[in-house]
Amino acid sequence: MGLLAVPKFIKEKYGHLYHTEHISLFAHTRVFVDIASYLYKYVCTFGCTSSRWLNSFANLMLTFVKNGVIVVVIFDGQAPDAKADEQRERRELRSKTKERADVMQEALEAFELGTITTEQRQLLVKELQDRRAYNQQRQGSLLHPSSSSEGSETTTPTLTPGELQELRDIVRSLQKQCTSLSKQDMLDLKQLLTACGVTWMQAPEEAEAYACWLVRQGYGSAVVSCDTDCIAHRADIVVFEVDSRTGMIRYVNTQELLDAWELDDEEQLIDFGILVGCDYNPGSRVNKIGPVSAVKLLKQYKSIDNIPNLKDVSVLQHEKIRLLFNPQYEEPHIEALVPNLELLQELKQRREDLDERLAGQLIYHRNTKRLISVVSTAATSTSDDDEQKF
């Protein structure tokens, strides 16, 4: 999701531009949250058979509200036609993931019945190998010798209880990745936000594009999203990581990126996104241009139009995609909501495992911090109408 290889590029080459601060940095200002990326994260973690994903989202909102941040949640509208290929790839990936989970589940059931085949056993062992190699790479530490997968296919006649549990966990994780929220789930989320007094908006098109446009127009100070397309959408500040436990965030300032890359204007960030590959043109990777090369080319040639010897300019679709990164919307109506306990109780009746205590904290802090903000603004305000957008 987003610009290919860019997060790693920034962290490795320009790590000093990944700022780590407390979320209270944005106290008394408005931030827009691209909900889609967080929904995907929570559903993959918890699935959607319970309300744990919903409780996690309420906890995320609480992190902002209790620190005095005015949060507005943005829901996706209609995706542009240019994103059809990317959406198809996601559907295909979910289908392959489901097939993989089903095959593993069948092999585990065969093991428990004593009918497992050699092929099924090898498949399970390989899954263990791959998962351990992945964990080792993430943790940067050596595996315990007993976990070594070298020669496992021939030397492991059976699977230990611990390995079986590990495999079951892998299957559950894969199954969660295949799940998707229903229309009722989305309605329940909107009802929770409304009940707790958290403002939400339906984007005309994509949430991240609309959120970035709102920030560029001065309606807020930052976009909160996991989608690196926000860099090409040129929001002033993009918060990519939020730790709900500590309130710590990691963000980038797009002007600082421009300065570090020695680019002349923010429009070059659009061409940067097109060159490395974004959600609108996944086929652009045929040119095999990574972030390092993209920065060098734009620094030298200023624009895609001036770059010589590109392997296949047609796959870039740069003229069309530039327009998608420069959307125009009508002036928004951002409505401040008042908490509604009746709506919360109605939702609780449908979802018995909804964390009512967490929702209550969200309402309490929303009311308290909003009152403090209003009093503070009334006492010190000398700003004009444009500044009141915040």
Name the predicted role of every residue range.
Residues H16-A27, Y134, S149, Q255-F390:
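Non-catalytic nucleic-acid-binding/docking modules located in mid-to-C-terminal regions
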Residues N67, A195, T199, Q217-G220, ...:
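Short amphipathic alpha-helical interaction elements and helix-loop-helix interfaces
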Residues V215-S284:
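Long, highly charged, low-complexity intrinsically disordered interaction regions
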Residues E21, M61-L62, D229, S284:
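Beta-strand elements of modular eukaryotic interaction domains
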Residues Y42, K83-A84, H233-R234, R285, ...:
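Intrinsically disordered, low-complexity regions enriched in proline, serine, glycine
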Residues G2-A5, E12-K13, F26-P204, Y210-L214, ...:
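Noncatalytic, basic helical substrate-engagement surface that gates or grips nucleic-acid strands
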Residues I10-K11, Y18:
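N-terminal donor/sugar-recognition subdomains of glycan-related enzymes
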